[in-house]
Each structure stands twice: as structure tokens, then as C-alpha cells.
């Protein structure tokens, strides 16, 4: 079995390096991840900014046999049909306007190109989407919830928390993939985890060591030119 090098808690990554090297990984090694390291990461990330110090994030870490059970349940759930739950929020605006539509399309096509899956291969693309619900083979998974009564500012807090989690993971030699695709199955996941009805599932996250030999691991999505998102007023 292939193994990655575990950088460990003594990592000397700078913040700049962690930001530059963090990517959404969609192929993981089976190598297990230290649960104490994962828990410590979630604790450390709680220093993320939070308006009014509300700290609205609620985390569920799934590993070992419980993750095996979840993957099997979702394999059966998505095998023949794809009947999602009633969703709590739309991942993208409808309709998605430019330039956002083109950015999303290009990222998807770049990924499928690396996988060798053409636009006409609909079944292969559907199967690739199902891989989301196997966490791309990752040995650890995170689900993040937020109370129904929280507003947009608290959702921003949640995003800052998750970014901090991912940077800390990267600084400790781990990779991740935030997955809003799990928002399609909020009731299914909540029932599996025993989460209260008043909480919304925001996303899942695959966590583990990237498979360096997988073609999709070479994916680096483009970023817009600075002039598209920065205006300096002086």
C-alpha cells in the first residue's frame, strides 16, 4: 500500500506556503490519519474570526468503521438512481451568470480532461459525481453544520473556520476537499449522525493523503486576474 510522508505537528509550513499549496484533492491514499491530529486541528481552527464570537460551526468527524458504514450506505443510495433529499440551500445561484458560469464550466472540464472523460461520456461523468459520496477514497470525513436561525454573517464565519481547518491540515501534511455536494443529502446525513433537526448541513470534507499518482491530483484550478477582483482607492 502506498503511503505519504506525514509531516506531523512540527510542520514548518508558513501560512503563505499552506495557502499556495492547498488544493481540493479528489483522489486519496488509503493510509489512515491520526484521529488526535484531526481533533487538534478542529480545536486550533476555532481561533478563526467570528462576528460577536458566536462560533456557529458544529463539526462531526467520521472515521474507521463508521465511515465504512456511511460509504456503503451512500453506495447503495446512489447506485441505480440519484434521489436526493429536500435541500436546505442552493449551492449556486439560479441562473448562474457570467463570469461565474464560465469559471465553473472550465474547472469541471479541466478535471474531466485529466480523467480522460469526454463530454459525450455521460455515464462516466455521473459515476465520477458519485465518487463525491465515497469521499474520493479518503480515510476521514468531516461534516459541518450550522443552526437554521443563523444569518449570512454566520455562514461567512463558517467559511472562515473551514478555510482555517484546511490550511492547518495542509501545514500538517494532510490534504482535503470541501464538498458542498453533500448538501444534496441533508436529512440522510443528519439521520446517520443523529443531528438535531434545527441544524443545517453546510458541507462535507474529505481528509487524508493525496494520491500523487492519480491523474486528477495534478488539477490546479485557474484564478482570475487580479484586476478582476481588486480595486485600489487612493
Model feature map: region roles:
Residues 1-234:
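Acidic, surface-exposed loops and disordered segments
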